[in-house]
């Protein structure tokens, strides 16, 4: 059995696991930065031309026929495709991934900060279904995304999903904050404490 992504996980489940692990779900901005892998002028994580050998997506006319040029008709094991420039696997295709951000179609308030937190839950809505509950942003596309249906296997693409929904094509990944570097003053004190000089 391969190392498959965890699926059938609602947002609340993913968030609970992240808290337990001492990590968190990425913001939409963090996710997109990681997905681009240092390449900010390309359409896909791997370049500007679509290639079925780069991500687990639907090849053919959805939902009638999948040519499976990538070798998979459903979820693939993690690492079945080449990593991006940061060494991250499956940032597009395979399964959608939850982000910490609430969905708002116009991304209001996100354009002026480096790591925007997105909109508030109160402002989150789907203009086509304003009566529905607030939605979270999902990123990356999945093995069900096809050119004729859902070509969202691009870092900049986004979709919304009800927070209480877990499906066979939505998973998550976690982010951990870098540990603070020891400052020179602290290193000097530590050296003194273990027999270092006081120079």
Segment roles from a protein language model:
Residues 1-155, 159, 183, 190:
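Functional-site microenvironments in short loops/helix caps that host divalent-cation chemistry
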Residues 176-178, 188-197:
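Pro/Ala/Gly-rich low-complexity, hydrophilic intrinsically disordered segments
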Residues 131, 165-167:
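Short coil/turn motifs at beta-sheet boundaries
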Residues 167-182:
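Short, structured beta-strand segments at or near domain termini in extracellular proteins/domains
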